[in-house]
From Swiss-Prot:
The keyword GTP-binding applies. Component of the Pelota-HBS1L complex, also named Dom34-Hbs1 complex, composed of PELO and HBS1L. Interacts with the SKI complex. The modification Phosphothreonine is found at residue 229. PANTHER family: TRANSLATION FACTOR. This is HBS1-like protein. Residues 443-445 are annotated as: G5. It comes from Mus musculus (Mouse). Belongs to the TRAFAC class translation factor GTPase superfamily. Classic translation factor GTPase family. Residues 128-154, 166-239 are annotated as: Disordered.
C-alpha cells in the first residue's frame, strides 16, 4: 500500500539535520532585512549578561538600614517601589529609587521624573573593597561590606552566643569577635571610626590566598570581660508608631464632617441624571468630560442621558439606560464631605440597592412628578414603596424627597402637594418622623433648584424652601462607633498593581492604621493592611464611617469574597449558620411557615436561608409574647424566629452593633420581612 511505503521509506535524517538555536527567535539562514530584524526579532547576543557580585546582593538586601523609617513609612516606601519597578524594571537599583522616593517625600511622580532625567540609566554595580581578616594582608579574594558608624548604631551586629564558665548570655554585641564555623569567617565591628570593616568569607566562594592555618586562632571573650561595655540588645518584632486616631478624627471633623448618602427611587425617576447634573454644577465634572458625554449620548440616540453617564460608567448601563450597580463618588458641601452612592431602581437589582442602602447614613428619595409615572412607582409593584421600607429598615432615619421632573408639569403647586400628601402619609407609616423628611421640587435635566435656589417665577411664587444641596448640607451625621472593635464589610475585591490585593468597603466600627493585623471572617484567615486609600488618596488611618480601599498582604485573594467582614484578631466577629432574630413581616401573599425558603440580605451578603422555627409572635409596641409556637406568620406581624443559612455568615447582635445587626429577607423577587439579630447559635 502506498501510504505504508511512504512511512517505511521516510528519511528521518532530514529532521535532525539542522541544529536548534534556542537563543534566537529566527534562524540566521532566513532572508530578512536588518530594519525588520531590529524591530521584530529578539537576539540574545545584543543583550550581554551582566555579572553581579555577591556583595551587590548583600548590600541591596540591606539598602534600607541607613534610613530610620517607621513601619508605616516602610509600607509606603515598598508601595512606591512597586509602582516605580513597573515603569523602570530592573535597570535601576533599589538604593537609587529609595533615595529618590525619600528625597521627594513618597511622591512617585517626582521621584520617577528625577530618575528618568538622569543621562543614560545603566545597571548599577558597586565595586567592592578588599579587606583582610584579622588585620593581616591576604592574596585571596574575600567579600567585604562597608558599614558606617550611623548604620552600626541603628542595627548593631549581634554575636550568636557568648559562653562563660558560669552562665550563658545571648544577644550581646562582641567587639572584635572573630569566629569560624564551617569555613565561614565573621568579624563583628565595634563602635569606632567609620573606617572599621566587616569581613565575610563565604564557603561558597573559592579562596586561593592564605590558607586557614596561616590565620591567627580565634579568641573568645567571656561575658565578664565584656561587662564594662554597654551593649544595646535588639528587640524581637518591630515597634510601630501609633496614631492617636481620636485626636486626628477631631481635627478632621473640625473642618468638614463625613456623611454617606444613598440615592433611591423607582426606575426612570431620574436619579442618575439628577445627581450627575449636581456634580457637574459643583465642578466635580469638567466641561471637557461633560461635552464628551453629550456627544456620545447623542450618537447613541439618548441625548437626555448625558448627565446620567457621569455615574453610569459601564457600557451595559449606558446601553440599557438603567443603573445596575451602585455608583460611588464624592462631593463637598459647605460643612460636609458627602460620599454619594447612586443605587439602581430596577426591581431586578434590588440586592445591589440593599448593599448601597446598608452603607448609608441618610437618603434622597427621587420620585417622578409626571402624570402616571408617580402613580406607577408608588402603587403595588412599584419600587418607591419598597425602597422607602428598605432604607428605614436598614437604619436610615433622615430622608430628602426630590420631586423630580417638575418642569414637565409646569411647576404646578397642586401636583407637588398631591405627591407630598400621598408620600408623606406612607413614610410616616414606614417609621419616618415628619421633622426628618423634607420635600423639594427639582428638575434634574434643567438643573433647577439643585445647587442654588430657583429663580424661575413659576416656582418661586409658591416655594420658598431650600434647594437640594442645602437640604443635604443640613443633614445631621450619626454618631460613629469609634470605641468599638474594628469591623469592615467587604463590598468589592480586586487585584491591584503591585503586591497583595485590594478590598473595598465601609468601616462600620472602630478604626484601622497602616500595618495593622486583620482577621477575615468567615474564612478565618489573617493578613496585614499594607495601605489605606480614602477618596483616592493614601492615608495612614481611617475610622468608622469611611469608605476605604485596603491593600492587603499575607493572604490569598481566592479566600476572600464579597460579604466577608474584617475585624481585629483579638476581638473577632462570630460566624454561624443558625441564629435567632426578631422580624417584621411586610405585605406578603403567601404566609411564612416552618421551612419557608428565603434569601438573606445582610450588608453586602446575599445568602440562601431557611426559617427553621417559628418561636413566638410578639407585640409590636411592647415586645411581649402574644402567641407561642405559631403555625404561620401573616403580613404585619412581629415574630421571633430561628433561621439557618447554607454557609457560615459573620453576624453581630443588634444590641452590640446596630449597624451589623440588621438584615432583610426576600422571596420571589420581593421583600417579605426585615429583622434584627437577637441571638447567635454556635
Amino acid at each position: 500500500m502506498a501510504r505504508h511505503r511512504n512511512v517505511r521509506g521516510y528519511n528521518y535524517d532530514e529532521d535532525f539535520e539542522d541544529d536548534d538555536l534556542y537563543g534566537q527567535s529566527v534562524e540566521d539562514d532566513y532572508c530578512i532585512s536588518p530594519s525588520t530584524a531590529a524591530q521584530f526579532i529578539y537576539s540574545r547576543r545584543d543583550n550581554p549578561e551582566e555579572e553581579y557580585g555577591y556583595e551587590d546582593l548583600r548590600e541591596s538586601s540591606n539598602s534600607l538600614l541607613n534610613h530610620q523609617l517607621s513601619e508605616i513609612d516602610q509600607a509606603r516606601l515598598y508601595s512606591c517601589l512597586d509602582h516605580m519597578r513597573e515603569v523602570l524594571g530592573d535597570a535601576v537599583p533599589d538604593d537609587i529609587l529609595t533615595e529618590a522616593i525619600l528625597k521627594h517625600k513618597f511622591d512617585v511622580q517626582k521621584a520617577l521624573s528625577v530618575v528618568l532625567e538622569q543621562d543614560g540609566v545603566q545597571p548599577w554595580k558597586e565595586k567592592s573593597e578588599r579587606a583582610v581578616c584579622a588585620g593581616q594582608p591576604s592574596k585571596g579574594k574575600s567579600v567585604i561590606s562597608r558599614s558606617s558608624q550611623s548604620e552600626s548604631e541603628i542595627v548593631p551586629k549581634v554575636a550568636k552566643m557568648t559562653v562563660s564558665g558560669k552562665k550563658q548570655t545571648m544577644g550581646f554585641e562582641v567587639p572584635g569577635l572573630t569566629s569560624e564555623e564551617n569555613g565561614l569567617s565573621v568579624r563583628a565591628p565595634h563602635k569606632g571610626p567609620p573606617g572599621d570593616d566587616v569581613s565575610v568569607a563565604s564557603p561558597n566562594i573559592p579562596e586561593t590566598g592564605t590558607p586557614k592555618s596561616a590565620l591567627p586562632p580565634p579568641s573568645l571573650q567571656t561575658s565578664e570581660e565584656l561587662g564594662s561595655t554597654p551593649t544595646p540588645v535588639r528587640k524581637s518584632g518591630k515597634l510601630r508608631q501609633q496614631i492617636d486616631v481620636k485626636a486626628e478624627l477631631e481635627k478632621r471633623q473640625g473642618g468638614k464632617q463625613l456623611l454617606n448618602l444613598v440615592v433611591i427611587g423607582h426606575v426612570d425617576a431620574g436619579k442618575s441624571t439628577l445627581m450627575g447634573h449636581m456634580l457637574y454644577l459643583l465642578g466635580n465634572v469638567n466641561k471637557r468630560t461633560m461635552h464628551k458625554y453629550e456627544q456620545e449620548s447623542k450618537k447613541a440616540g439618548k441625548a437626555s442621558f448625558a448627565y446620567a453617564w457621569v455615574l453610569d460608567e459601564t457600557g451595559e448601563e449606558r446601553e440599557r439606560g438603567v443603573t445596575m450597580d451602585v455608583g460611588m463618588t464624592k462631593f463637598e458641601t459647605t460643612t460636609k464631605v458627602i460620599t454619594l452612592m447612586d443605587a439602581p431602581g430596577h426591581k431586578d437589582f434590588i440586592p445591589n440597592m440593599i448593599t448601597g442602602a446598608a452603607q448609608a447614613d441618610v437618603a434622597v428619595l427621587v420620585v417622578d412628578a409626571s402624570r402616571g409615572e408617580f402613580e406607577a412607582g408608588f402603587e403595588t409593584g412599584g419600587q418607591t414603596r419598597e425602597h422607602g421600607l428598605l432604607v428605614r429598615s436598614l437604619g436610615v432615619t433622615q430622608l430628602a424627597v426630590a420631586v423630580n421632573k417638575m418642569d414637565q408639569v409646569n411647576w404646578q403647586q397642586e401636583r407637588f402637594q398631591e405627591i407630598t400628601g400621598k408620600l408623606g402619609h406612607f413614610l410616616k407609616q414606614a417609621g419616618f418622623k415628619e421633622s426628618d423628611v423634607a420635600f423639594i421640587p427639582t428638575s434634574g435635566l434643567s438643573g433647577e433648584n439643585l445647587t442654588a435656589r430657583s429663580q424661575s417665577s413659576d416656582l418661586t411664587t409658591w416655594y420658598k424652601g431650600m434647594c437640594l444641596l442645602e437640604q443635604i448640607d443640613s443633614f445631621k451625621p450619626p454618631q460613629r462607633s469609634i470605641d468599638k472593635p474594628f469591623r469592615l464589610c467587604v463590598s468589592d475585591v480586586f487585584k491591584d498593581q503591585g503586591s497583595g490585593f485590594c478590598v473595598t468597603g465601609k468601616i462600620e466600627a472602630g478604626y484601622i492604621q497602616t500595618g495593622d493585623r486583620l482577621l477575615a471572617m468567615p474564612p478565618n484567615e489573617t493578613c496585614t493592611a499594607k495601605g489605606i486609600t480614602l477618596h483616592d488618596e493614601p492615608v495612614d488611618w481611617a475610622a468608622a464611617g469611611d469608605h476605604v480601599n485596603l491593600t492587603l498582604v499575607g493572604m490569598d485573594i481566592i479566600k476572600i469574597n464579597v460579604g466577608c467582614i474584617f475585624c481585629g484578631p483579638k476581638e473577632p466577629i462570630k460566624a454561624c449558620t443558625r441564629f435567632r432574630a426578631r422580624i417584621l413581616v411586610f405585605n406578603i401573599e403567601v404566609p411564612i411557615t416552618k421551612g419557608f425558603p428565603v434569601l438573606l440580605h445582610y450588608q453586602t451578603v446575599s445568602e440562601p436561608a431557611v426559617i427553621k422555627r417559628l418561636i413566638s409572635v410578639l407585640n409590636k409596641s411592647t415586645g411581649e409574647v402574644t402567641k407561642k409556637k405559631p403555625k404561620l406568620l401573616t403580613k404585619g406581624q412581629n415574630a421571633l424566629v430561628e433561621l439557618q443559612t447554607q454557609r457560615p455568615v459573620a453576624l453581630e447582635l443588634y444590641k452590640d452593633f446596630k449597624e451589623l445587626g440588621r438584615f432583610m429577607l426576600r422571596y420571589g423577587g420581593s421583600t417579605v420581612a426585615a429583622g434584627v439579630v437577637t441571638e447567635i447559635k454556635e
